[in-house]
Amino acid sequence: MTRAVIFDMDGLLTDSERIGVSGIQACGRLQGLDIPEAFILQTLGATSAHSGALYRANFPGIDVVRLFEDFRVYMHGKAERGEIPLKKGALALLDALDARGVPCAVASSSMRETVRLYLDKAGVLGRFAAVVTGGGRLPSKPAPDIFLEAARHLGVMPAHCLALEDSANGVRAGRAAGMRVGMVPDLIPFSPALAPYCDFVADDLSRVIPLL
C-alpha cells in the first residue's frame, strides 16, 4: 500500500527540463561553448556539484560558476514570468492524493531557492508536506539520500513510499532508497536498461492514479 508519494521536480512535476536544455546551451554560448544536448541529458537529476564536475571534465576552461549563475538567472526569469508550467496530469494526481489523505513531498537535486520558486509560481508549493533538495548538502542522485530524507520528513518508511521520477539517475536513486518506483519519462525515454529500477512506467502523472 502506498502511504506517501515522493516527487522529483524538473521534468516530472514541472516542464523545466525541456526549457533548461535550451537555457544551458544559451548560457554556454556566452562563453563560446557549444554544449550538446546529449551531454546535458547525462546531467539530469544530478546536483550542481556533481554536474559541475562533469562540465569541468568535458569542457576545459569552462567557468562553471558563471555558467550556473547565468542559467539560474535565465530559469528564474522564466519562472517569474509563468513560463515553467506543470506537467500533464500533475494537478489530477495531487488532487487524488489529497482525496485519499496520502501525504507527498518533493525530492529534487536542484537548489532549494529554485525548487520553491518553481513550485510557488506553479501554484502547488503548499500542497507538499516537505520539500527536500540537494544543493550540495546531500549526495547527488543516483545516491538515495534525497529520497530517504524526504521519507524521514514525512514519517513514512521508505518501503511504503512511491518515488516518481523521469530520469535514469532518479529511478536508480528511488530503487536504492528501497522505495517503489514509477517512471514518467520526459526527455529521457524508458529503456530496457532501466527496467530493474522501475515498478511501472506511465505516460503522464494522471496515469499514476490507478497504480497507487
Segments predicted by a language model, with ranges:
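Conserved SAM-binding loop
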Residues: L13, L86, C104-A107, A163-L164
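Helix-loop "lid/cap" segments that line or gate small-molecule binding pockets
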Residues: C27-G28, T47-G61, Y118, A150-A151
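Metal-dependent phosphoesterase signature
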Residues: L54-A92, R100
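Short beta->alpha linker loops
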Residues: I19, A46-T47, P85-G89, S110, ...
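Active-site neighborhood of HAD-like aspartate-dependent phosphohydrolases
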Residues: M1-Q42
